[in-house]
Each structure stands twice: as structure tokens, then as C-alpha cells.
Amino acid sequence: MTIAMAVFRCKSDQEQGELLAWLGGDDGLVKTRVYDGCQGIETLSGPDSVVALYERWESVEHHQAYVGWRMENGLGDLLETWLAAPLEIAYYDETGV
């Protein structure tokens, strides 16, 4: 299993709210949770209009296929309106500690 951390640095609290609304809507995380390889996802919010996704995936390749599918279907355009900086994605392995 792979952990993917996606960090969205929104332009303001308004854009953060719009992103969270989209994530909670019919085109958001409901589709992520049934995408091939997704084993779970949690949404976090932080200071300075940040949203982070803690995602559990079967593999890095599964997550990258998912991100590619999202970008092909218009998410990149939406992110440009909401984000002050490019989307950040990092991958981690669980240590069992």
C-alpha cells in the first residue's frame, strides 16, 4: 500500500471553501473512493487556506493513473482558479512502527 499526500494551497478561505464543496459534491471524492486502487481517503484543512488529502492507494501507479484521469476531465482548470501554488503530491510507505 502507498500513502499519497496531496496539498492544495488555496488563494483564500473563499477558494478553500469552494474546493471543499467540490470535494464533497457528486464529482469529488465520491468518485475517488470507487476509483481502481483507492483504499481510502481523508480530507484535512489547515491554516492559510490549505486543504490536504491523506490517501491510501494500492500503488503509486494506481494513484498516478487516477490523477491523470482527473486532469483529463477538467480538474486542472478548476485548480487554476482555486490554488495560489501548484498542487503538491508526495508518496510515502507505512513503516508499521
Listing of model-derived features with the role each one plays in the protein:
Residues 1-51, 58-70, 84-97:
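Short S/T/G/P-rich N-terminal loop/turn motif that feeds into the first structured element of a domain
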Residues 73-79:
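Anionic, Ser/Thr-rich low-complexity intrinsically disordered regions
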